[in-house]
Amino acid sequence: MSTQVQEQVVIINAEGQILGRMASNVVRLLKEGKKVIIVNGEKAVISGEKNRVIESYKLLLTVKTLFNPYRNGIRRPRSPINIVKRTIRGMLPKSSKGRRMLKNVKIYVGVPKEFEGRQFIKFPDSDVSRLKGKYVTVEVVSKELGWSG
């Protein structure tokens, strides 16, 4: 029984992976019913010039609401874990099935001790070597947004 459960867990190394392409591959695995663990989530990259990428993320922080922002403001992701998870969430179905699939995703900053020495997967179609232009890591974006990690 435990060997069958172990086969359903996929561990992905996000270091040097393009965030959007990696997220679409993760969604494909989730639709197959697998549990996905992502390590080095802060080392995933977002394509584009650094200033443009950061400004586009900061633009989301300036959105105002007519409601009391202290009671129910618009929550925006700032930590690398939440940025990656939000990207994956945007690609999942907007239904109860999508919410169940999102619970099968775990994202870690760095590599936890329990996963050291394990085999990681990297998607060849989402490797950073595909990019000809500039890119920025998720860690840099989240530190610019105010993440204190």
Swiss-Prot record:
One of its GO terms (biological process) is translation. InterPro entries: Ribosomal_uL13, Ribosomal_uL13_bac-type, Ribosomal_uL13_CS, Ribosomal_uL13_euk/arc, Ribosomal_uL13_sf. The gene is rpl13. Keywords: Ribonucleoprotein, Ribosomal protein. Belongs to the universal ribosomal protein uL13 family. It comes from Saccharolobus solfataricus (strain ATCC 35092 / DSM 1617 / JCM 11322 / P2). Pfam families: Ribosomal_L13. Part of the 50S ribosomal subunit. Disulfide bonds: none annotated. It comes from the Archaea. One of its GO terms (cellular component) is cytosolic large ribosomal subunit. SUPFAM superfamilies: Ribosomal protein L13 (SSF52161). PANTHER family: LARGE RIBOSOMAL SUBUNIT PROTEIN UL13 (PTHR11545:SF3), RIBOSOMAL PROTEIN L13 (PTHR11545). GO terms for molecular function: mRNA binding; structural constituent of ribosome. Gene3D superfamilies: Ribosomal protein L13. This is Large ribosomal subunit protein uL13. This protein is one of the early assembly proteins of the 50S ribosomal subunit, although it is not seen to bind rRNA by itself. It is important during the early stages of 50S assembly.
